[in-house]
Every structure is written in structure tokens, then in C-alpha cells.
Amino acid sequence: MITFVICLAALVLGYAIYGRFVERVFAPDDRPTPAIAKADGIDYVAMPYWKVFMIQFLNIAGTGPIFGAIMGAKFGPVAYLWIIFGCIFAGAVHDYLSGMLSLRNGGSDLPSLVRQYLGGAAAKVLLVFAVFLLIMVGTVFVYSPAEILGHMGGSKVMWMGVIFAYYIVATMLPIDKIIGKIYPVFSFSLLFMAVALVVMLFVKMPVLPELWDGLGNMGQKTDPEGFTDSIFPCLFITIACGAISGFHATQSPLMARCLKSERKGRPIFYGAMITEGMVALVWATVAMWFFYDAPQPGYEQIAGGAANGFHTSAPMVVNLVCNDWLGVLGGILAMLGVVAAPITSGDTAFRSARLIVAQALKINQLPKANRLYICIPLFVASFALLIWQISNPDGFNTIWQYFGWANQTLSVFTLWSITVYLVREKKPYIITLIPALFMTCVCTTFLAVSKTAFGL
């Protein structure tokens, strides 16, 4: 518990001190934002700051800081260090500066920013890469909620159809019609679940692995046959959304088009990432208790769940912990956490993909027919990937690993683009150069040495 409290305080101090330093480096001013200068009632819509924050938080979070932190907790207390240092010095910097660059460039999407700072060839690679990643995000976040809902009633295929139908509607409608109205509610639910678990941590005061117990790979010691991942680079791929995630750079332009002032960028972009880091920290702590100090070892409970047809272990951990610690309320919160949150992440992923394709092909998005023309191929590709995922018993975990690698590779493009911007502006580029070098090393190493990387 001492490590958990120290790490939580570190995230708060990181926002207050380092976040303010990064803000001074960028130097926001009072120029008109895209929400004002380019208002169109569809994607460029000025919204209240609190609503922009809640939507940004849910867009970048979803179940990423839950599932990723749970799987990363298998490595042991070393996961704490990646969450706090990654979040403060890499992830929040990445999110803030990518969001602010989008603001400064008329709400431009990530491929457009990469083209401006890294050149046309890099932008073309990123365009394909980003759309593929976003389709993969939508696919990953169809399967897990459909499986959970299928265990409650109805068939898994039926729930997949329902979720896809929602995706089509949410992707095409103006951003303030569905996303602007219901996302803040789901954000509150996700935060409330994390706060409730923090309260229960202090009530139960469980014995937890601490940093001074050692930074070795606890997963390999506890389950040597079932857990074979190495700390480097696998930990830094597994915990993405709680530390740094390239996916966030595809989402920040959505809110950059809804922000009324540049000066609110730090609490919106940097603050949302720090908040996500806190959620990841909570779930990493709870998961470490589950795997290593619970009355019945977590690996045994997961094996029992798999025997009953529950193949995705991370959602199962959420259900087991929430129901055990929070009772009936926990079951409701778990539903919101592992059903609603991934669905909302999926629909904003497809929305981002639609906007990226539209901007690349210069297709006007005001006519509904134009939006539909882009959406149909995206959903067909996602459905094909989903069929493969269903046919493969380990499909979810395989896609999650590829999603994690693609996610972090996207962050590499973003960090190098921001570094070039800072060099051109004669600003302290070291704040993104070091994270860019580190994440480049992580992604190339994973591709070169991980068995999962060549699993297909």
C-alpha cells in the first residue's frame, strides 16, 4: 500500500509541476480555436470545458487502463514505475502536445501533422497504419463486451450485431448528439469505479507487493509455464493506455475541434492522461493483490473461468474483483467498466478513422451519404477481423498484443513529429526526444524478439 500511495502522489505532483513546465514550453495564447473559427455543427462544435475533459478522458481510456494494467500487473511492482514515469514524462506530454498542435493547425488529424513535420512518405505510412490501428481498436472492443453480454443472455453474435449497429449510428451523427450527451455519464462511472476500489483498498488494507520487494518478473516466478513474457519490451507494450498510447493522438484532434481556448489544454489533454494513469495505478494494484495475495491465487481463478467458456481473462478479473469487493454495486460498475467503456472507445475509434480517411481523400463530411461511403468499408474490414478473432481460441489476446505494438508504434510517429516541431521552434525538444528514442527502442525490440510479434 505504501508504494501505491507514493505513486498516486507522484502523479498529482507530476501534473502540477512537470505539466506546468510543458505548458510553458508550448506557450498557449488567446488565438481563436478551430471550434470557433471552423464551426460546422458536425465535428467542429464548441462544448463546455468539463464536458470536453470527460469525453477526452473516456475517449483515451475506455478499458485500456483497466485491461492493460491488469495484464501488466502480472509482471509485479515494476509495473508501478512504468505507469508513473511513463505517464508523467511520456504519455501526458505526448497527449498535451499532440492536442495543442492539432489546435494550432485548425484541428488537423495525426497524419496531417506527421506530413507537416516528418514529410509525405512518413504521412502515407502513418495514414495506413493509423486506420488499421483504429479498425483494430473497434474490433477488440466489440468482442469483449459481446462475450460478457452473451454470458448474461442472448447470443454473442447477436450482441456483436447490436454493437456494430450502434457504431454506425454514433460514427455518423454530429459529435454533440450522442458522444456529447452520454460520454460524460460513462466517464463519471469509470472514475467512480476507480474511487470505490481505492476506498476498498484502504478499508481492506491487503498485503501487496512493494517496490522494495524486488523488480523482477513475478509472473515468470509464479506461473513459469503460462507466463513467458519478458519485462523488456513486453511490459511497455502491455501497459499502453495507462502510460503512453499512440491511439490518444488520434483522439485528441476530436476534442481539439471542441475546445474554446488554448489555455484549457493542460487540464484537458495533460490532465486526462494523468487521470487515466491514476485509473491504471488502481487496477494494477488491485490486480497484483488478485494474482499474488488473494486467498485463491488469481491464476487458478482465471483457469476456472476459462474452463467455463470465459476466454478473456482481463474482463473476468474485473468481474471477480468488483463483485467480491463491491457487491451488487460492483456488478453494475463492472458492467459499465467492461461493457460500456470499450463500446465507447470503439465508436470514437471508427469516428477518428472516418475523419482521417475523409481528410486524406478531401471528402466533405457534411452530407450524410459521404460519411456512409467511408464508414461501410471500415466496418466490413472490422467484421472480417472479428470473424478471425472468433475462430481463434486465443484471438483476443493475440489481437491485444498486436494492438499494443501498433499503438506504441503510433506514439513513435507522434513523438518524433512533436520533436521536429520543437526543434523548428527552438524550444526544449529534449522533453519529447527521450520518450521518442525509448519508445522506438521498445517497438523495434518487440518486433524483433517477441514470439507474439510473429504469431500470425
Regions found by a protein language model. Name each.
Residues 47-64, 200-206, 217-283, 333-345:
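Hydrophobic, membrane-embedded alpha-helices of multi-pass small-molecule transporters
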Residues 10-11, 90-106, 110-174, 240-244, ...:
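Helix-loop-helix module between adjacent transmembrane segments
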Residues 2-19, 72-102, 111, 331:
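Extracellular loop-to-transmembrane helix junctions
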Residues 10-66, 264:
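Membrane-interface "cap" regions at the ends of multi-pass membrane proteins
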Residues 121-127, 131, 157-161, 271-280, ...:
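Loop-to-transmembrane helix boundary motifs in multi-pass membrane proteins
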Residues 201-214, 270-320, 390-394:
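Extracellular/periplasmic helix-exit of transmembrane alpha-helices
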Residues 7-17, 130, 134-138, 170, ...:
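Selective recognition of specific alpha-helical transmembrane segments in multi-pass small-molecule
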Residues 138-142, 146-161, 170-171, 191-221, ...:
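Hydrophobic alpha-helical segments and their helix-loop junctions in multi-pass secondary transporters
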